[in-house]
Amino acid sequence: MKLACVVLLTLTFCSSAALGRAPSYKYKRLGSDLDAQTRAEPGIALMGGGSDLDDAFRWLCGKANGGDFLILRAQGKDDYNRYVNKLCQMNSVATLVIPNRKAADEPRVAQIIRQATVIFIAGGDQSRYVDFWKGTPLQEALNAHVTAGKPVGGSSAGLAVLGQFVYGALDNKSNDADLASREVLADPYAKRVTLVRDFLKVPGFDNTVVDSHFAKRDRMGRSLGFLARIVADGWSKAPREIALDEKSALLVEVDGRAKVVGTGMGAYFLQLTDPPEVCKQGQPLTLRNVSAYHAPSGAGFDIRGWNGHGGEAYTISVEAGQIHTSRAENAVY
């Protein structure tokens, strides 16, 4: 007899299992083994990495109305299961690890994703998400999830893949350091500056780059380079970026209104108003009149109207790879 109980279930559903082969993915679930029959509310939680924010996860759980919480990873363990299960009252909390394209092609993987009430894409390495998941039934199931108006969230690498335009980190080696702003400002077409598009179709995040660890890792320069590249490559005339610092999150409602929570530096919103003057291979970037808005914790921003309250608007320019701002003492963040 099937029991619906609060225990750890290690499930090995996989089409290849019937043939005696080990499953190509890992799926571990806490809570009921029966999927909830509940109606979720739309919402998007952008988390900037560092320490997990209880408020952001509680908000995501609230959008799920007690349904089934699914964490997606390309590598790693199921540590989020216990964290979310303790934090929220959910029907179930599960982690699905999809470590290669073979796993992403498994019919059971897409089925698990389609049955989830809320999905959170964990941090890690976004190149794995792009390499392993793009062009697979997993990607289709993820897009079906957001199209259906179900809540979704991501942190760090899992945050990066939520925008239409994505820094893919595709040419990074396992021991490479983080792509630094100085590298991109010196040459926006450097080998490691790999941009991809249309991985997910999250409402309100078209024409947008999303990034994390922003002030903590000094990522303003590389973000400006990404935006300039997007224009120079003909992808968009006026691309935008939403960037979250560590220990910060942006909670976006269905109408585009969002609030910033957390103890970090908050959120940054960038938009190009003029095309770059110099954005060529082997040459430092020159770019002027970038619109910027810094929204600290407690501030709000409307991603549809692209305006905020409780924060500070300023402008940024780049001259031969050097950043200049309209703020006092040329402050970038």
Locations of the language-model features?
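Glycine/threonine-rich flexible loop motifs
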Residues: 126-136
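Portal/gating segments that form or line small-molecule/metal binding sites
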Residues: 76-115
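Short internal beta-strands
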Residues: 70-75
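Catalytic-core regions built around general acid/base machinery
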Residues: 112-115, 135-149
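Bacterial N-terminal signal peptides
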Residues: 5-15
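Catalytic nucleophile loop
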Residues: 122-123, 146-166
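C-terminal and late-domain segments of enzyme folds
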Residues: 21-66, 87, 173-333
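Structural motif
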Residues: 46, 118-122
